Regions:
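A compositional signature for long Ser/Thr(±Pro)-rich, low-complexity
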Residues: 2-423
Length: 423
């Protein structure tokens, strides 16, 4: 009888304790949500997110992708000229002409470059930087620069000469270096995994260069010969080119020497899983399964180009199965971030209309699906607008380091503001 009474008292005490603890957790979360609402209740941020009632912790990412580029302080004509020479070298490595304009001032689809056969653009440095495809001539008047099939090439710039800056002052933006990146990831992340196509692979590549502090050779495999390393050094790491540099990059930080990573003190894992079409989906599923339940695991996912920009198929074959795995695991981790397909348009308007209108539609459909399920959406198109692409698809170090800085700032803010409300 005595044992029964003691058991009853103990059980009653546990019930009371659970009620108190749950009450404290509810109050903490309610108070934290109030703080979040207060943090975002401002003239600027309210206007930016008007009409969307999504979770604040997920829309934090939008706070960093809404912004603009500012040229770096102290930028000189010499630096601009040197950058243009670098770009010409990249074009040459891609088997493109070093100059994409003709000397006779003609441009457009009907005026091709010899011997490459590429359509001619206009010289951005000349007095006539605009191509009017209707006339096939370069010019500088409104009729040449502002018509529906005109393109002003003087407005495009190399991202390496500029810094990305969020529009809202409510988005504190830190420029991460190797040490601060390591500190952030060591404290808050167990696995940072990138799944998708070459656009997503470039995020992993850039993160690797940032962590190693070596933008020249930081992502090249150690087994390469000295000649191969030289052929693919620097920004050539971002382009396949004549030396197939994309095949000479690491896919996992574990491929590097330990001392290259956070002074030998990296406690997190990061790797790229190249799974960009339906046939490679099983590899992506295996990756997600290995991360189920890991509270500090994060996946950045981006596919579409190699699935014919079919949003219905991507949702059915990638996102829904991923979400089902995560939900059925009884946990809400790993954290899934969807990255849209970036867009570049420093080419003829006719090419841009043909190639990028379908991308914009795909991005819109995917973003709508993700936002309805509180999946953070990394809107990369806002970041790549008006920056140069040398191959018409990819951006180099400048565009990708901006993306990685945005991602790190988002994660930092999410960890600081939202972490206790998510546990």
């Amino acid at each position: 009888m005595l044992l029964r009474k003691q058991f009853f008292r103990l059980f009653s005490g546990l019930i009371v304790l659970l009620v108190v603890v749950n009450g404290i957790i509810w109050i903490s979360r309610h108070h934290r949500k109030s703080n979040l609402d207060e943090h975002f209740r401002g003239e600027g941020i309210a206007a930016e997110f008007a009409g969307w009632n999504g979770d604040i912790c997920n829309r934090l990412l939008d706070c960093y992708t809404l912004g603009s580029w500012e040229f770096k302080p102290g930028l000189t004509k010499k630096m601009i000229h040197e950058r243009r020479e670098v770009d010409k070298g990249i074009l040459e490595n891609l088997d493109f002409p070093r100059e994409l304009h003709r000397e006779d001032g003609r441009c457009g689809q009907i005026n091709r470059l010899f011997p490459s056969g590429l359509p001619s653009l206009c010289d951005e440095e000349s007095e006539k930087p605009c191509c009017n495809e209707a006339t096939g001539l370069c010019g500088n008047s409104n009729a040449d620069c502002l018509c529906p099939y005109c393109k002003d090439f003087s407005k495009y710039f190399a991202a390496e000469l500029a810094n990305w800056k969020p529009s809202s002052q409510k988005c504190p933006f830190q420029h991460f270096n190797s040490d601060s990146t390591c500190a952030l990831l060591n404290e808050h992340v167990s696995d940072l995994v990138f799944i998708g196509d070459s656009f997503i692979g470039h995020l992993f590549l850039t993160l690797t260069l940032l962590i190693t502090g070596d933008p020249v050779r930081g992502a090249l495999r150690s087994t390469l010969s000295e000649e191969e390393k030289e052929q693919c050094s620097g920004e050539l790491q971002f382009f396949a080119g004549k030396h197939s540099c994309h095949l000479k990059l690491i896919r996992d930080l574990e491929e590097l020497d330990t001392n290259q990573l956070c002074n030998g003190k990296a406690r997190f894992k990061s790797y790229f899983v190249e799974a960009y079409n339906v046939n490679q989906f099983p590899l992506a599923v295996k990756t997600v399964k290995n991360l189920l339940g890991k509270r500090k695991a994060i996946i950045v996912l981006g596919v579409g180009i190699h699935i014919h920009l079919n949003a219905t198929m991507v949702i059915a074959k990638y996102l829904k199965p991923f979400l089902s795995l995560i939900e059925n695991s009884g946990n809400d981790r790993p954290l899934l971030i969807w990255a849209t397909i970036h867009q570049v348009d420093n080419f003829l308007t006719s090419d841009c209309v043909k190639n990028y209108s379908p991308i914009a539609k795909f991005n819109e459909e995917m973003s709508k699906f993700c936002r309805a399920r509180n999946i953070p959406v990394f809107e990369t198109s806002t970041v790549t607008r008006n920056i140069k692409s040398n191959d018409g698809q990819h951006v180099g170090y400048g565009g990708n380091i901006a993306k990685v800085q945005i991602l790190l700032n988002y994660l930092k803010s999410r960890f600081e503001i939202c972490q206790s409300s998510e546990h």
